[in-house]
From Swiss-Prot:
Pfam family, one: RRM_1
Ranges of biased composition (kind: Polar residues): 10-25
Chain positions found as Dimethylated arginine: R135, R137, R141, R145, R153, R155, R159, R161, R165
UniProt name for this protein: Single-stranded nucleic acid-binding protein
One annotated GO biological process: negative regulation of translation in response to stress
UniProt cross-references to Gene3D superfamilies, sorted A to Z: 3.30.70.330
GO molecular function: eukaryotic initiation factor 4G binding; mRNA 5'-UTR binding; mRNA binding
Residues found modified as Omega-N-methylarginine: R125, R145, R149, R161, R165
GO cellular component: cytoplasm; cytoplasmic stress granule; nucleolus; nucleus; P-body; ribonucleoprotein complex
InterPro entries found in the cross-reference section: Nucleotide-bd_a/b_plait_sf, RBD_domain_sf, RRM_dom, RRT5_SRSF_SR
Subcellular location: Cytoplasm; Nucleus, Nucleolus; Cytoplasm, P-body; Cytoplasm, Stress granule
Length: 294
């Protein structure tokens, strides 16, 4: 096991449930988010202003509509492909009607994406659910079924491409080469994600929205009680990013983001692999096994 992997693994295992860094991050939005009167807008053009978005809704909902486009400093020199916004209406809304009428409207030469707003509590608990399961080169499994199985075989020893998997009674099943597995047409597998990155930050970096991000959170152990719990703030260093639209060139997306620096880490990017439907679930070690973070 390399020194880098051992160091990263030990740092995670030594965290206590009482560590201040594990406390959930305070919301960065000024808008009080209530899904009954607030919507989330993704894929907002950099040139778009709060007033530009407000004018889109004023005719139907009146001048009391308020818009917030959070401003964030990017110290790594990377400028995200788009911004996001929160729109708050003066009364309760019919979300489906708003989505039908305003989703994919073009503002400043860019389609906006209307999504349901989620409270900070919902964002902490919620996970992306989609169709099919994806496996990345580092052995991530089942991320888009709402259940996460960390595909590691032991501390610091994660499976790489097409690694053989254990079957029942210790019998190994024949491995399936990665290049023979079906690739996703709209999803990227991202490795070496900063441990403290949130779904919203990942979404902003890739120019999409939080609902299109699968960001597995770490399993950790309370040093005092021995209890295993899911971290509120530390992810497992990997993510899956899905891009919406009918004409997504996922190979081009992979090339666009390959080698980009997010936070202080250079990302490893690949097109996600779709896990076969008959691929059996495995019970893997939930602790002491983390992705390499150099």
């Amino acid at each position: 096991m390399s020194a880098e992997i051992e160091e990263a693994t030990n740092a995670v295992n030594n965290l206590s449930i009482n560590d201040s860094e594990q406390q959930p991050r305070a919301p960065t939005h000024k808008t009080v988010i209530d899904p009954e009167d607030t919507i989330f807008i993704g894929n907002v053009a950099h040139e778009c202003t709060e007033d530009d978005l407000k004018q889109l809704f004023v005719e139907e909902f009146g001048d009391e509509v308020s818009v917030e486009i959070p401003i964030k400093e990017h110290t790594d020199g990377h400028i995200p492909a788009s911004k996001h916004a929160l729109v708050k209406f003066p009364t309760k809304i019919d979300f489906d009607n708003i989505k039908e009428n305003y989703d994919t409207k073009v503002v400043k030469d860019r389609e906006i994406h209307i999504k349901r707003a989620r409270t900070p509590g919902q964002m902490q608990r919620g996970g992306f659910r989609g169709r099919g399961g994806f496996r990345g080169r580092g052995g991530f499994r089942g991320g888009f079924r709402g259940g996460y199985r960390g595909g590691f075989r032991g501390r610091g020893n994660f499976r790489g491409r097409g690694g053989a998997r254990g079957g029942f009674n210790g019998q190994k099943r024949e491995k399936i080469p990665l290049d023979q597995m079906e690739r996703s047409k709209d999803t990227l597998y991202i490795n070496n994600v900063p441990f403290k990155a949130t779904k919203e930050e990942v979404a902003e970096f890739f120019g999409t929205d939080a609902d299109s991000i699968s960001l597995p959170m770490r399993k950790m152990r309370d040093q005092h009680t021995g209890r295993i719990f899911t971290s509120d703030s530390a992810n497992r260093g990997m993510a899956f990013v899905t891009f919406s639209g009918e004409n997504v060139d996922i190979e081009a997306k992979a090339e666009e983001f390959k080698g980009k620096v997010f936070g202080d880490r250079e990302l490893t990017v690949d097109v996600a692999v779709i896990r076969p439907e008959n691929d059996e679930e495995e019970i893997e070690q939930e602790t002491g096994s983390e992705e390499k973070q150099e």
